[in-house]
């Protein structure tokens, strides 16, 4: 089948280089035509990464004028994701846009409306949507194995130094703004729109960064807790999703691996059941997931299938 011609705008996002690595691995689906980076500082810092070796560096206009271009990965450093995405939809492009979707809801809503009106795909960089351990959790919940869900606990933290802290302080929401969306996305997939959200923002240092975030999402018969920080030592190993119901619990920890470990280490799910079901007996099980080839491969494969018309956009 014909490959999808795709380019990348921006290399400043922390996910940008590994996204490019995934696009290049997925050569049955994609032909990468080039990279755009208008900020000389980002090009100096990251332009020589191996993920970009051998690719042409283009201006944005040169990228949009590439014959047969169908899609763009928007990987700017976070402050102009929406404006870049808007230029892409104006040029008739499908996009993968890294998160978050801006600090205000209305501009993001208007952007989504543009994609709907033009029947173009916008895929957001919430990679846990295609995580096999998370999808096993969703299956357990939607199949009724867990009964009525009454509690969700989700954690996504890491440790970062001064340079990242200075960059992150440019966003009003701090760590919760950058990381919380991943977790809120999971909770809404499980429980829907909450009745109320109460945030608790804290600073562990006397600087301008909310580096320790906590939020409670309230439902008629359930609560969900969201925790994010950039001060937890080896925090990636402690990323976690726990879903508790009246008939069972799913516990995923770690929620993911470092990018270098995906193809080596399968994720594990701790499943505890009150009753037998068609696949598992009552009791506690260590369920081993299939090995992933990379953090983003499944999601970007899904994007290709959406663009080709093989599946509808599930989001």
Predicted region positions:
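Rossmann-fold dehydrogenase core element
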Residues: 110-128, 148-152
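Predominantly a Rossmann-like dinucleotide-binding segment in NAD(P)-dependent oxidoreductases
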Residues: 128-206, 214
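Contiguous beta-strand/loop segments that form the cofactor/metal-binding neighborhood of enzyme cores
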Residues: 184-261, 297-311
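Short, Asp-centered acidic motifs that coordinate Mg2+ and/or phosphate
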Residues: 34, 71, 151
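Beta-loop-alpha module in the N-terminal Rossmann-like domain of NAD(P)-dependent dehydrogenases
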Residues: 52-114
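N-terminal Rossmann-like dinucleotide-binding module
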Residues: 1-50, 304
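C-terminal helical cap and adjacent loop that interface with cofactors, partners, or active-site loops
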Residues: 273-315
